[in-house]
Amino acid sequence: MALSDADVQKQIKHMMAFIEQEANEKAEEIDAKAEEEFNIEKGRLVQTQRLKIMEYYEKKEKQIEQQKKIQMSNLMNQARLKVLRARDDLITDLLNEAKQRLSKVVKDTTRYQVLLDGLVLQGLYQLLEPRMIVRCRKQDFPLVKAAVQKAIPMYKIATKNDVDVQIDQESYLPEDIAGGVEIYNGDRKIKVSNTLESRLDLIAQQMMPEVRGALFGANANRKFLD
C-alpha cells in the first residue's frame, strides 16, 4: 500500500526530529565533556600556580630568615668587638696610669737606688759577656754608677768570671722615659732593655690573664691563658 504524501511528510518530520534530538544530545555530551576537561585543566593550572606561589614565598621566607641570621651575627660580632675594644681601652688606661706612677718611684731616691741595683745586676746576668755597656738617663748617672760598682763584685762571685762594665756617657737614654737602664754587650749587637717602661710592659704581658680575670671575670670559652 503506497504511502500518501502526508504520511511521507510525517515520517520525514519524525526522522528529522530524531536526528535533531540525537544531534542535540551529542552536542550536550560534547559540551559537558569539554567543560569537564576545561575544569580539570583549570584546576591543574590553578594548583600549579598555587604551588609555584607557595614555593616562591617559601624561598623568600628562607632568604629573609637567612638575612636575619646574617644581620644578627653581624650585630653580635660588632657588639663583641665593642666590648673587646672597651676592655682593651680600660687595660691600656690602667697601664698608662701605672706608667705615670713610675715617676713617683724615681722621686724616692732610696727606693729607686734599690731598683736600679736589681736592674743592673739582672742585666749583667742575662748577657754574661766579658765586656758590657750600660746606658741610662743623664740625671741617673750617679745612681747607676753606684749600682754598677755594687753589681761587679756580686757578678764575679756568682759567675767566677772577670767583667768590664762601662757606663755610656756619650749616648744617654731619653730624659722623657721614666728611668731604668739598657745594657749592651761589647759590640752593642745584643741588648737587654731594663728600663722601667719595658719592665712594666713585660709584667703586664705576664699578668694579663690575671688582670682580665680580675676586671671581667673568667672566660669560659678560653682554653689557654695568654
Swiss-Prot record:
Bilayer-crossing regions: none
GO cellular component: apical plasma membrane; clathrin-coated vesicle membrane; cytosol; endosome; extracellular exosome; lysosomal membrane; microvillus; proton-transporting two-sector ATPase complex
Gene Ontology molecular function, alphabetical: ATPase binding; proton-transporting ATPase activity, rotational mechanism
Modified residues (N-acetylalanine): A2
Superkingdom of source: Eukaryota
GO BP field: proton transmembrane transport; regulation of macroautophagy; synaptic vesicle lumen acidification
InterPro entries with a match to the protein in the record: ATPase_E_C, ATPase_V1_Esu
Tissue-level expression: Kidney; localizes to early distal nephron, encompassing thick ascending limbs and distal convoluted tubules (at protein level). Ubiquitous. High expression in the skin.
Membrane topology, as annotated: Peripheral membrane protein
Chain positions found as Phosphotyrosine: Y56
Keywords: Acetylation, Cell membrane, Cytoplasmic vesicle, Disease variant, Hydrogen ion transport, Ion transport, Membrane, Phosphoprotein, Synapse, Transport
Chief location category: membrane
Family: Belongs to the V-ATPase E subunit family.
Disease: Cutis laxa, autosomal recessive, 2C: A form of cutis laxa, a disorder characterized by an excessive congenital skin wrinkling, a large fontanelle with delayed closure, a typical facial appearance with downslanting palpebral fissures, and a general connective tissue weakness. Most ARCL2C patients exhibit severe hypotonia as well as cardiovascular involvement.
Assembly and binders: V-ATPase is a heteromultimeric enzyme made up of two complexes: the ATP-hydrolytic V1 complex and the proton translocation V0 complex. The V1 complex consists of three catalytic AB heterodimers that form a heterohexamer, three peripheral stalks each consisting of EG heterodimers, one central rotor including subunits D and F, and the regulatory subunits C and H. The proton translocation complex V0 consists of the proton transport subunit a, a ring of proteolipid subunits c9c'', rotary subunit d, subunits e and f, and the accessory subunits ATP6AP1/Ac45 and ATP6AP2/PRR.
Name the record gives this protein: V-type proton ATPase subunit E 1
Gene: ATP6V1E1
